[in-house]
Amino acid sequence: LITIVSEPHTDLWQRTYYGFSNDNAPVLQMKTSNKFFSFTVKTSFNSSALFDQCGIAIYLDSDNWMKASIEYENEEYQRLGSVVTNNGYSDWATHDIPSSIKEMWYRLSRRGSDYYIETSPDGTTFHQMRTFHLDKGDGEISFGIYAASPVDHSFTAQFSEMEVGECKWQPWSAEDTGFKQTASKRLRVYTLHNSKKAVTAD
């Protein structure tokens, strides 16, 4: 069991939309050159202030990293989501869940420089959160756990049931679904008389 008490005014974010850069959230990490593995951890937390967050992270440098966590919003809902930062710009993908949820499992899987995040409310059934790529994530990486409080607040996060093992993200092929690759087709856009557009490929 690892306990982290977050420090006020800590966060990870780079530039996009808000314009600022925050790079001071504590991340407890381990290093690996293994290109095929999965990392699983359970988080428990008592967050109660705006943007309180804890979860998993890959931190390569200030401009290249990812995090997945629950960020507290208010007494009704919080945001389960992920941030991927490549070359100094962050994105943020979320969906709302009840604020009564105070535990979450995360599973991070790696295949080369591509990564896959899953979450689970019970540690048994995992659901896809995101598939993503890190531009500088093909070599040795540092990954682990973090907690942060962007506002003037602090909370306690606990991390347990940590496991690093074989990659649980199975490779996918077009034959699995009968999907045929059509990347070589050229896209053409025609402007119609009513200003609507029809799109065809040949």
Explain the meaning of each model-derived region.
Residues 1-187, 193-200:
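Extracellular glycan-recognition regions
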